[in-house]
């Protein structure tokens, strides 16, 4: 069972936390991480893009000029794709992109991603994360103190001060523990957990 240092906001170690093997020291299953990520990104797609075909655009179906004798290339309809305002040939049509993944496999993928980040020493645990007032400068100073950037912050319950202090900082995302997902875990270089969030995540993923 791996252990990790717990820090306060001044980067002083205030304790140690034992991490669950099943969540933070699991086998890294790259095929499951790839599948879970592909499914998450696919499910974001609305699939509503559509172009009109020659049968759907407005316009006459009459032959624009006679077949022979004009010197022009033969044409059958002004709604054909080669005409301005004509229909689109082989254009996109509405499509269902939704994919599904069973709970056990999805949990295993998230555990693999967390274990990968843990093995790469990219996880930091805080005893708590809160600010006495809304201050972007205070949040930036906190990030500099820990020498981290491009971070995902996972809390069990974040305050309004924390949310408003970090929202204008680029490459920082704040999530509650129940919104943890494979894409954000793999996207961000560092992950900051509160101690309560670690326990909440372990409780959910160990079910």
Curated annotation (Swiss-Prot):
Recorded GO MF terms: rRNA binding; structural constituent of ribosome
Region described as Disordered: spans on this chain: 50-75
Domain of life: Bacteria
Record's GO cellular component terms: ribonucleoprotein complex; ribosome
A GO BP annotation: translation
Subunit structure: Part of the 50S ribosomal subunit.
Family: Belongs to the universal ribosomal protein uL4 family.
Biological function: One of the primary rRNA binding proteins, this protein initially binds near the 5'-end of the 23S rRNA. It is important during the early stages of 50S assembly. It makes multiple contacts with different domains of the 23S rRNA in the assembled 50S subunit and ribosome. Forms part of the polypeptide exit tunnel.
The name this protein goes by in its record: Large ribosomal subunit protein uL4
């Amino acid at each position: 069972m791996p252990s990790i240092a717990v820090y306060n906001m001044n980067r002083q170690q205030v304790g140690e936390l034992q991490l669950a093997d099943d969540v933070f020291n699991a086998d890294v299953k790259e095929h499951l991480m790839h599948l879970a990520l592909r499914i998450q990104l696919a499910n974001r797609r609305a699939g509503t893009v559509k172009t009109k075909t020659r049968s759907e655009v407005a316009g006459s179906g009459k032959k624009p000029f006679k077949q022979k004798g004009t010197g022009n290339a033969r044409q059958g309809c002004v709604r054909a794709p080669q005409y301005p305002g004509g229909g689109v040939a082989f254009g996109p049509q509405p499509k269902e992109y939704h994919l599904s993944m069973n709970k056990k496999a999805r949990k295993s993928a998230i555990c693999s991603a967390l274990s990968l980040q843990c093995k790469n020493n990219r996880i930091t645990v805080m005893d708590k994360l809160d600010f006495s007032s809304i201050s972007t400068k205070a949040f930036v100073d906190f990030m500099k103190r820990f020498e981290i950037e491009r971070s995902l912050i996972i809390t069990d319950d974040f305050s309004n001060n924390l949310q408003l202090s970090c929202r204008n900082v680029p490459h920082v995302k704040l999530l509650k523990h129940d919104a943890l997902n494979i894409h954000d875990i793999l996207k961000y270089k560092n992950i900051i957990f509160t101690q309560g969030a670690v326990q909440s995540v372990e409780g959910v993923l160990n079910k």
